[in-house]
């Protein structure tokens, strides 16, 4: 069985929920404290043993490439001023993994974005990490899926429980037999209508896929929202060759919408010893209804 050493991070979306901030800045570069959200995703992949990452970009995404590239002039200035802590942080972001880029020329959905990276992946199994979900866990979420793949040799989809009222926002699994945190899946349903979801186990932005998925993406028609949905291709793969779901451990932060982004920023700030006490005092003084 081939080891998983490659990952895809889709980052071609327009980020319309964060306009006008994302008119000129990629959504993935919006910071949680002092790091852009996409760096948290790359760090998770690196901690899981991923060596090569391809980021699928679109127009106006050059800032992502610049962030993970060497900035020699900046490094020299920091070195001369003795700001070694900042220098190490700047250099760290360039040393996480081998990072490559491919452009999704048309906004045709997540499935199309993944298909855009097929030449980079070749015939290897690979990981997918979506940028809207930051996951905090001792064992990285994607590493948990890789370990499940190593047990089964099959594609593994990361899931977590959500409130039943929110199931229409996600891809949902119809689970069959359960093995610990791993499920056999009867069906994958993309964004079911309210009240029709087969469970409350939602697909949460982490995947380990065999290269067979590209055969299904190549012929996948439009699905929900008029886009080529990855979930639909996974469901077709599941009919031909068992796909598993894995209820991964970890705290998930939704940074793909404004309220979740604010909550994440506050929680991360409270974890930072340098600002915790002052932030707590500030929150206490707010006139909250």
Swiss-Prot record:
The lineage of its organism: Bacteria, Bacillati, Bacillota, Bacilli, Bacillales. Catalyzes the formation of UDP-glucose from glucose-1-phosphate and UTP. This is an intermediate step in the biosynthesis of diglucosyl-diacylglycerol (Glc2-DAG), i.e. a glycolipid found in the membrane, which is also used as a membrane anchor for lipoteichoic acid (LTA). It holds the Pfam family NTP_transferase. The gene is gtaB2. InterPro entries: GalU_uridylyltTrfase_bac/arc, NTP_transferase_dom, Nucleotide-diphossugar_trans. GO terms for molecular function: UTP:glucose-1-phosphate uridylyltransferase activity. It is an enzyme of class 2 (transferase). The keyword Nucleotidyltransferase applies. This is UTP--glucose-1-phosphate uridylyltransferase 2. The keyword Aminoacyl-tRNA synthetase does not apply. Pathway: Glycolipid metabolism; diglucosyl-diacylglycerol biosynthesis. PANTHER family: UTP--GLUCOSE-1-PHOSPHATE URIDYLYLTRANSFERASE. Its EC number is 2.7.7.9. It catalyses: alpha-D-glucose 1-phosphate + UTP + H(+) = UDP-alpha-D-glucose + diphosphate. Gene3D superfamilies: Spore Coat Polysaccharide Biosynthesis Protein SpsA, Chain A. It comes from Staphylococcus saprophyticus subsp. saprophyticus (strain ATCC 15305 / DSM 20229 / NCIMB 8711 / NCTC 7292 / S-41). GO terms for biological process: enterobacterial common antigen biosynthetic process; UDP-alpha-D-glucose metabolic process. It comes from the Bacteria. Keywords: Carbohydrate metabolism, Nucleotidyltransferase, Transferase. Belongs to the UDPGP type 2 family.
